[in-house]
Amino acid sequence: MTDHLALLRSKLVHLARMRSHLGYSVTQVQQFVPVAHWPALAADQHESLAAFRVRFSEYQEHLGKTMRAVAIEEEVDVDRFGTVLAFMERLQVLDSADHWKLIRELRNAVNHDYEDNSAKLNAFIEQMLAEVAALEGYHQRLINFCTQAYGLDAT
């Protein structure tokens, strides 16, 4: 196994841990979202929301870095991430590059905007919860590609 494939395998293993942690956060947040009165949230609920937002963001970020590593292995120009996304779409890892970008915009918006608007914050959190399944699907398709193309075992 080349050094780059070993690095790719370690990224996939790390993604699996991140996926598990994100799943835990989803379970915690689903217990109290939507939130009727944000100021009344308990400290542990705020902590669960913060953990969910961070884990969601980091999971997508690391998934993107892993897709970039696959593109490098396949000798695709990775100077522009849009090229990586288009390549992942061709491999059928992603449904569409636009959907990936929508998820990225969502995570950026929830981390920077509307913190005083309960309705918008609820909508962002609920949409993020709904998009977890898409990210997990992209992750699984990336694992499948790496297993077929490189014989990598991501466990």
Which sequence ranges carry the predicted segments?
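Solvent-exposed interaction patches of small proteins and small membrane subunits
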Residues: M1-T155
